[in-house]
Regions:
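Long, low-complexity or tandemly repetitive, helically biased scaffold regions used
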Residues: 2-7, 11, 15-142
Length: 144
């Protein structure tokens, strides 16, 4: 793959990342698929940066500027602002669902109550899995 092809691919992937980040509304609970997409794209772009640093000519200042701008975007906008809010939202969702499940009367349950409880458990499982996925990203941050 030529340097130009690599830069073009990088630009495309970074644009996807920017779009995903700009679509986030942290005031609302984020759907799991949106969270996974964002972290996948962040990881993808960060990996591309590492590969590109090794493969692109050091004298190419436009490349270094793009990389620097991208690293700043990830660090200042995502890692410092968005990532902590996502972690907080996930933790709050887990707490809320857990409280809802604990408040359900464990005695005589109607079919509807049992179905609602099952849905809450499924949602709790999904969010807890997402939290583990996001924590892996968090671990990577602390290793940098």
């Amino acid at each position: 793959m030529s340097s130009n092809d690599l830069m073009e691919l990088f630009d495309t992937e970074f644009t996807k990342l920017e779009n995903l980040v700009n679509e986030i509304n942290l005031e609302n609970e984020l759907p799991v698929n949106q969270i996974v997409s964002i972290y996948y794209q962040i990881t993808n772009v960060a990996s591309m940066i590492e590969v590109m640093k090794q493969q692109i000519d050091n004298s190419d200042s436009s490349f270094h500027e793009k990389i620097s701008n991208t690293e700043t975007f990830i660090s200042k906008k995502f890692n410092s602002i968005i990532h902590p809010k996502i972690m907080t939202n996930i933790t709050n969702s887990i707490s809320e669902i857990t409280n809802n499940l604990q408040s359900l009367n464990s005695e005589q349950k109607s079919k509807e109550t049992i179905e609602n409880e099952a849905k809450l458990y499924e949602k709790l499982r999904e969010i807890m899995s997402t939290k583990e996925f996001v924590k892996q990203y968090d671990s990577g941050l602390s290793n940098d």
